UniProtKB/Swiss-Prot annotation:
Function text: Envelope glycoprotein that forms spikes at the surface of virion envelope. Essential for the initial attachment to heparan sulfate moieties of the host cell surface proteoglycans. Involved in fusion of viral and cellular membranes leading to virus entry into the host cell. Following initial binding to its host receptors, membrane fusion is mediated by the fusion machinery composed at least of gB and the heterodimer gH/gL. May be involved in the fusion between the virion envelope and the outer nuclear membrane during virion egress.
HAMAP family: HSV_GB
Residue stretches of biased makeup (Low complexity): 24-37
Transmembrane segments annotated in the record for this chain: 786-806
Motif stretch (Internalization motif): 931-934
Bias (Gly residues) ranges: 71-85
Protein name (database record): Envelope glycoprotein B
Keywords (A to Z) from UniProt: Disulfide bond, Glycoprotein, Host cell membrane, Host endosome, Host Golgi apparatus, Host membrane, Host-virus interaction, Membrane, Signal, Transmembrane, Transmembrane helix, Viral attachment to host cell, Viral envelope protein, Virion, Virus entry into host cell
Oligomeric form and interacting partners: Homotrimer; disulfide-linked. Binds to heparan sulfate proteoglycans. Interacts with gH/gL heterodimer.
Membrane topology of the entry: Single-pass type I membrane protein
Length: 944
C-alpha cells in the first residue's frame, strides 16, 4: 500500500501544542491560559500571521434552522476579537443562516486546508429546492425463459461431392516424321538442323495396328492438288513395320513404336543432304473427366472438348469436329500391343476422333454404371434436427458439427439425380435402424434430401418413439414426418451443380460451436434475466421504504450523482446540490466546543461537535461561511450538530480520497482509505462454466481423392515429358571458356603483387581479352569455308600485285629512259627516218642563252636539242664521244622537254602552281639522283 496522495497546497499545519492537554484537565472543562508562556505566545503569533489574510478574528454569530422539520434546533452566540460583526444570510425556503458562529477561539493552526474530493465534489444539498418529481415502480412482472425450438430425432447420411474424376483408357495413334539436314565438309560433317512433325494415322491404318500390330513405312499428304509422299529411310518402298514396346514406360502410360533409333545418312563432300526417318507411335494412356463430364484430359496434357459418354445420339456434350468423329460397335482389337499372337477382345462401343496430328480412341460406357456425382462421407446414427424460422439445423455431436439447410427438400425416390445413391442409402438406413432403434422407435415418413450451405447433401430419415406414436393415434393426430409439412420441389440443376463444388466443413464446425454456445448462453441469460427481474422488484420495494428515511442518499446512490431529495407526500422532489469553491474548503482540527465564563475566560463546555467544523466559500463570493462535514463530501450548514463529550473518543471522517482521525475530539492524523477494510455488499453471480468441447479434425476428402481430383496430374505429365526427353538421341552441348589460359595465369601473377598489381592485371586482362577476341574472330572466320575461300582470293590477289610491281620495277631498271619518258621512245620511232645528225668534232655545240638551266618556265619557242634538231640516240651521235659538259647540256634539254610535255595538264588546271614553283617530285628525285642543283641565275660560264 503506497503513501497517501499529497494535498493540493502542501500547507497542512500541525496542531498547536497548547491544545495537547492531559485527559484530566480536559475532563474538568477548564482551560489554562498563561500569558507568560513564551512558546504559547510564539505559536499564537505565528498562527495569527499565517491565517490573518483568510480568517478574521472578529466575533461571528450564526443561527441555523433545521431543514428537516422546519424548526430551529439550536442557536449559539459568542464573541471574539474585534472585527466585522454583521452577517450576510444565505436563505432558502426551509433554511436560513447568517455568517456568525458562537464566540470561540479560532486560529490558523486549528484548520486542515487543501482538501481533496474523489467521487463527489464539496457541495450543499440542504439549500436546494425540489423541482422534479419521481416515484418508484411497484408493478414489475417477470417472464420465464422459453427456448422456442422444435427438435426431431433421426438418422442422417451425409454425402459429399465426388471430386474424383472418371478415369478410363484412351489409345492414341500417330506417325512421327523426322527430317535431318546435314552438310559434309572435307573431314567434318555438320548437322545443320532438323524438323519433327507428328501426323495422324488414317483409320484403315489404325485398324491394322489394332488387329495386326503393325503399320506402314510411308505417309501421303495432299496439299491442294499435289500429293507428297514420304518414305522411311528414303527407301521409296511401302513396307510394314511391327510395333514393339518402348523401354521408357510410366505407371499410366504404355507406348509402342516401330523404330527406336533415328535414321540419317550424310551426303558427299561439300554437299547438303536431308533424310527422313518415320516412326509409328501407339500409346495407351489414362484420361480423366470431372463432373459434369463436359471434357476429358489425357495424362500427356491433351484436352478433348467432348464428353467421354457421347455416342452421336445421346445428349452429352461434344464440341469437336463431328465429321471426324466415328463410333464403331462390336469393335475387335488386341488386348495388348507389341506381343506375338496376343488375344483379341471385342469392345461393345468404340469411339474414334481424328485430329490433324493424332487419332484418339476410347470405349463408350453408360454413365450410371461407372460414375456418381455423390460419395458417402459420414453416417450419423443419432442426429438431432432443430427447426428455426427459415432453416433446419442438423446437429451431430459425434462430429462436433452443425449443418444448416433450407426448409425446401427433395425426395430420394422418383428422382433420377439420386439413382446412384438410392439403393446404398436405403440399405444403410435399414441397417442403422435395426441396430440402434428397432423396438423403441418407428420410421417417420420417407427419406428426404437437403442441401447444406456448405455444399453437402444430407439424406434425413426421421424417427418417432412408439409411445408418442401410440398417443398420437389415440388422440387422432396423423403421424407424419416433419419434413412433409414443407413443400417439396425439384431444385434448379444449375444451382445444385454450383452447390456441389463448394464443400467446406469449417462452416459446419463453426455452426456447431455457435449453436452450442448459443443454447447454453441463451439458457443462462434467460435464467439470469428472470432472477434479475425478481431481484429488481425486491430492491425497488426496499429503496422505496429507505427513501422515507433519507431520500437524498437513496437518490444519489441510484443516479450516481449528487442529488438533493425530500419527500413531498407519496412522491419525491429532486433538485441539484449547490457546489462550493473547492479550493476554499478547510476542516477544523478541534471538535471541542468552548464557552465563555463569567470572568471572561474560555472554558470547554460539556458538548462537542459531532462532525468537524468546515470553513468554505461560495463560488464568486469572498465571504467565508461555516458548516459541518457530512458524508460523501457534503457540507451541512450550521454548527449546531453537537453531542456530549465522551472520553476516550475515536472518530474517523472521510473527505475525498483520505480520512481524518480524531482522538478525544482532536485531530490526530490523516489515513489512506486503502488501509481501511471495505465491507463487501456485492452479491456474486454464480454461473456454471461452459463445458469443454474438443473439436475433431474432419477430413472431407482424403489425400488420394484430392490428388485424383484434377484432370491434369502434374506427376504423370512430368513423367511423360521425361520419357520423351529420354528418347532424344542427339544432344549437342558446347562449353566454351571465354578466359584464355594465359590470361588466367597473368591474372594470378598480378594478384600476387598487391592492389597495384591487381589493377594493372585488370587493365592487361581487358586489353588481352580484346586482342584475344579479335584474334579469335579472325581465326574463326578463316576456319569457316567461306573465310578460307576469301583468304585464298586475297593471297592470289597479293601475289599478282607483287608480280606486276616486280615486272614494272624490272622494266624501269633495264630501260629507265623508256620507263620514265615513254613519249621519248614513241617520238624516236616516229622521226627515225627524217632526223639528221650534226657531228661536232672538236668543240661542243653552241648553246643559246635561253638553253641554260633556269628555274623559270621554259621558252615555248625553243624546239629541238640545241637548235640543231638532232635527236639523241641517232646513229650519228652514237659514235660521237661527248664530254661531261655535253652530257650536262643534254640533261638540261631533257628537262625542258619534260616540262613541255607536262605543260598540257598545267594549262588544264590554271589555278595550280607552275612546275617551277613546285617542289621536286618522286620522278624528279629519281632523275636527278647523283646531281647537284645549279643556281637559278648566272651565265653559261658559271656552269663550269
Amino acid at each position: 500500500m503506497g503513501p497517501p496522495p499529497p494535498l493540493r497546497r502542501q500547507r497542512l499545519l500541525l496542531p498547536r501544542p497548547s491544545r495537547r492537554r492531559p485527559p484530566a484537565r480536559l475532563a474538568s472543562g477548564r482551560r489554562s491560559s498563561r500569558p507568560g508562556s513564551s512558546w504559547t505566545w510564539y505559536a499564537t503569533l505565528i498562527a495569527s500571521l499565517v491565517w490573518y489574510p483568510t480568517v478574521s478574528s472578529t466575533t461571528l454569530e450564526a443561527t441555523v434552522v433545521s431543514s428537516t422539520d422546519g424548526g430551529a434546533t439550536g442557536q449559539a452566540s459568542g464573541g471574539g476579537g474585534g472585527g466585522a460583526g454583521d452577517s450576510t444570510p444565505s436563505e432558502s425556503p426551509e433554511t436560513s443562516a447568517d455568517t456568525t458562529v458562537p464566540r470561540e477561539r479560532v486560529t490558523g493552526t486549528e484548520w486542515v486546508s487543501n482538501l481533496t474530493s474523489e467521487r463527489y465534489p464539496y457541495r450543499i444539498c440542504s439549500m436546494s429546492q425540489g423541482t422534479d418529481i419521481v416515484r418508484f415502480a411497484r408493478t414489475i412482472t417477470c417472464a420465464p425463459y422459453d427456448a422456442k425450438s422444435v427438435s426431431t430425432e433421426g438418422i442422417m447420411l451425409i454425402y459429399k461431392a465426388n471430386i474424383v474424376p472418371y478415369t478410363f483408357d484412351v489409345f492414341t495413334y500417330q506417325k512421327e516424321l523426322f527430317f535431318q539436314r546435314s552438310y559434309a565438309y572435307i573431314y567434318t560433317t555438320y548437322l545443320l538442323g532438323n524438323s519433327r512433325e507428328h501426323v495422324a494415322l488414317p483409320l484403315w491404318e489404325v485398324d491394322a495396328a489394332n488387329i495386326w500390330n503393325y503399320c506402314y513405312s510411308s505417309y501421303v499428304r495432299t496439299i491442294g492438288t499435289e500429293q507428297y509422299v514420304s518414305y522411311h529411310q528414303d527407301s521409296y518402298r511401302n513396307e510394314t513395320m511391327w510395333l514393339i514396346p518402348e523401354e521408357y514406360q510410366s505407371g499410366n502410360t504404355r507406348r509402342y513404336v516401330t523404330v527406336k533409333d533415328q535414321y540419317h545418312v550424310y551426303g558427299s563432300t561439300w554437299l547438303y543432304k536431308e533424310t527422313c526417318s518415320m516412326n509409328c507411335i501407339v500409346t495407351q494412356t489414362k484420361a480423366k473427366s470431372k463432373y459434369p463430364y463436359d471434357y476429358f484430359a489425357l495424362s500427356s496434357g491433351l484436352v478433348v472438348e467432348a464428353s467421354p459418354f457421347y455416342d452421336t445420339v445421346n445428349g452429352h456434350t461434344f464440341h469437336e469436329n463431328r465429321r471426324k468423329f466415328h463410333v464403331r460397335e462390336q469393335y475387335r482389337m488386341l488386348e495388348r500391343f507389341g506381343a506375338v499372337n496376343a488375344p483379341v477382345r471385342v469392345v461393345p462401343k468404340m469411339a474414334f476422333l481424328e485430329r490433324p496430328d493424332i487419332v484418339l480412341a476410347w470405349e463408350i460406357k453408360e454413365p450410371k454404371n461407372v460414375t456418381c456425382h455423390l460419395a458417402l462421407w459420414e453416417t450419423v446414427n443419432r442426429a438431432i434436427r432443430t427447426e428455426h424460422a427459415t432453416s433446419f439445423h442438423f446437429v451431430s455431436r459425434g462430429l462436433t458439427a452443425t449443418f444448416v439447410t433450407a426448409k425446401a427438400n427433395e425426395t430420394l425416390y422418383n428422382n433420377s439425380r439420386y439413382d446412384c445413391i438410392r439403393d446404398s442409402a436405403n440399405r444403410t438406413i435399414d441397417r442403422v435402424f435395426r441396430e440402434e432403434y428397432d423396438g423403441k422407435y418407428e420410421l417417420d415418413g420417407d427419406p428426404v434430401i437437403f442441401t447444406t450451405n456448405g455444399g453437402l447433401t444430407v439424406v434425413w430419415q426421421g424417427l418417432r418413439q412408439k409411445a408418442l406414436a401410440a398417443l398420437s393415434a389415440l388422440a387422432g393426430i396423423p403421424g407424419a414426418n416433419g419434413t412433409t409439412n414443407h413443400s417439396r420441389h425439384r431444385r434448379d440443376t444449375a444451382a445444385i451443380a454450383a452447390r456441389e463444388h463448394a464443400s467446406d466443413l469449417t462452416y459446419a464446425q463453426l455452426q456447431f460451436a455457435y449453436d452450442t454456445i448459443r443454447d447454453y448462453v441463451n439458457q443462462a441469460i434467460g435464467h439470469i434475466a428472470e432472477a434479475w427481474c425478481l431481484e429488481q422488484r425486491r430492491t425497488g420495494e426496499m429503496l422505496h421504504e429507505l427513501s422515507k428515511i433519507n431520500p437524498s442518499s437513496m437518490l444519489t446512490a441510484i443516479y450516481d450523482r449528487p442529488i438533493a431529495a425530500r419527500l413531498a407526500g407519496d412522491v419525491i422532489a429532486l433538485a441539484k446540490c449547490v457546489e462550493v469553491d473547492q479550493d476554499t474548503v478547510q476542516v477544523q482540527r478541534d471538535m471541542r466546543k468552548f464557552e465563555t465564563s463569567v470572568d471572561g475566560t474560555e472554558e470547554q463546555g460539556q458538548f462537542c461537535y459531532s462532525r468537524p467544523v468546515v470553513l468554505f466559500r461560495f463560488v464568486n463570493s469572498s465571504e467565508t461561511q461555516y458548516g459541518q462535514l457530512g458524508e460523501d463530501n457534503e457540507i451541512l450548514l450550521g454548527t449546531f450538530r453537537t453531542e456530549a463529550c465522551q472520553l476516550p473518543s475515536l472518530k474517523i471522517f472521510v473527505a475525498g480520497k483520505v480520512a481524518y482521525e480524531y482522538r478525544d475530539y482532536l485531530y490526530k492524523r490523516q489515513i489512506d482509505l486503502d488501509s481501511i477494510d471495505v465491507v463487501n455488499t456485492m452479491i456474486s453471480l454464480k454461473v456454471e462454466p461452459l463445458e469443454n468441447t474438443d473439436f475433431q479434425v474432419l477430413e472431407l476428402y482424403s489425400r488420394g481423392e484430392l490428388k485424383s481430383a484434377n484432370v491434369f496430374d502434374l506427376e504423370d505429365i512430368m513423367r511423360e515429358y521425361n520419357a520423351h526427353k529420354l528418347r532424344l538421341r542427339y544432344i549437342t552441348s558446347k562449353i566454351v571458356n571465354p578466359i584464355p589460359p594465359f590470361m588466367r595465369g597473368l591474372d594470378d601473377f598480378m594478384s600476387g603483387l598487391g592492389a597495384a598489381g591487381k589493377g594493372l592485371g585488370l587493365v592487361l586482362g581487358a586489353v588481352g581479352g580484346a586482342v584475344a577476341s579479335v584474334v579469335g574472330g579472325f581465326v574463326s572466320f578463316f576456319t569457316n569455308p567461306f573465310g578460307s575461300l576469301t583468304l585464298i582470293i586475297l593471297v592470289v590477289a597479293v601475289v599478282v600485285i607483287v608480280f606486276l610491281l616486280y615486272q614494272r620495277q624490272r622494266s624501269a631498271v633495264r630501260q629507265p629512259l623508256d620507263f620514265f619518258f615513254p613519249y621519248l621512245a614513241q617520238q624516236t620511232q616516229r622521226h627515225q627516218q627524217t632526223v639528221t645528225t650534226t657531228e661536232y668534232l672538236d668543240s661542243p655545240p653552241p648553246y643559246a642563252e635561253r638553253d641554260s638551266y633556269k628555274s623559270g618556265p621554259p621558252d615555248p619557242a625553243a624546239e629541238g636539242l640545241g637548235g640543231s634538231g638532232a635527236l639523241p640516240g641517232s646513229s650519228a651521235t652514237a659514235a660521237t664521244k661527248y664530254t661531261t659538259e655535253d652530257a650536262w647540256q643534254m640533261l638540261l634539254a631533257i628537262r625542258r622537254l619534260d616540262e613541255e610535255k607536262r605543260e598540257v595538264p598545267t594549262m588544264v588546271a590554271p589555278s595550280a602552281r607552275p612546275p617551277s614553283q613546285q617542289g621536286p617530285g618522286l620522278l624528279d628525285r629519281i632523275r636527278r639522283r647523283g646531281y647537284r642543283r645549279l643556281r637559278d641565275t648566272g651565265s653559261d660560264s658559271e656552269l663550269a
